[in-house]
Amino acid sequence: VLDAMIYIKENMDKTLTFRGSCRMGTCGICGLVINGKPRLACETQILLLNTDTIYLEPLHNLPLVKDLIVDHIPFFEKQKKIKPYLIRNDMEEYWNPTREYLQTTEEHLRYMQFSYCLTCALCYAACPTTATNPSFIGPQALMNTYRFIADSRDEGKLERMAIINNPDGCWGCHLAGACS
């Protein structure tokens, strides 16, 4: 789909505005709603959509900037709330480490799949709770909270749990499953 959008911009409508960067599904910036489903434009193959007509929309649940571009700031502000970095209790050791914080394979596997998130906001756009409650922290922030809680090197579990333990955090999720 991204190649088709580039073709349209170069040959048919130079005013069409969208985002695209890596063209291989690693940056997440080309997220759109394609035929009603949030997808990455660079990863979505037109032939596999099995239709003659393709409808493109900007991601839902985020403010529109122009055409197919949305403002990701509300999404990233919610991610920032959960402190998406390793928290250590000993700040001297944190800033001047005396050793590596090694992990076993099992410890790494506990959170590995959650570390692959592109922060593309597709889950956020698909979430019916985010659509009806702008204060809801969203699926990406909840997933990222778990990613750090499950990391054996992190000591911020209680701090993060306090952030999401409320109606706009984990208790606000209606378990619709649209995010996955």
Regions found by a protein language model. Name each.
Residues 33-36:
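Short strand-turn-strand beta-turns centered on an Asx-Gly dipeptide
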Residues 1-11, 57-180:
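Ferredoxin-type iron-sulfur electron-transfer modules in oxidoreductases and energy-metabolism complexes
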Residues 45-46:
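A generic structural motif
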Residues 22-31:
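Short, structured protein-protein interaction patches enriched in aromatics and acidic/basic residues
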Residues 42:
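Short beta-strand-centered aromatic/proline hotspots
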Residues 13-19:
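Active-site phosphate-binding and catalytic loops of NTP-dependent enzymes
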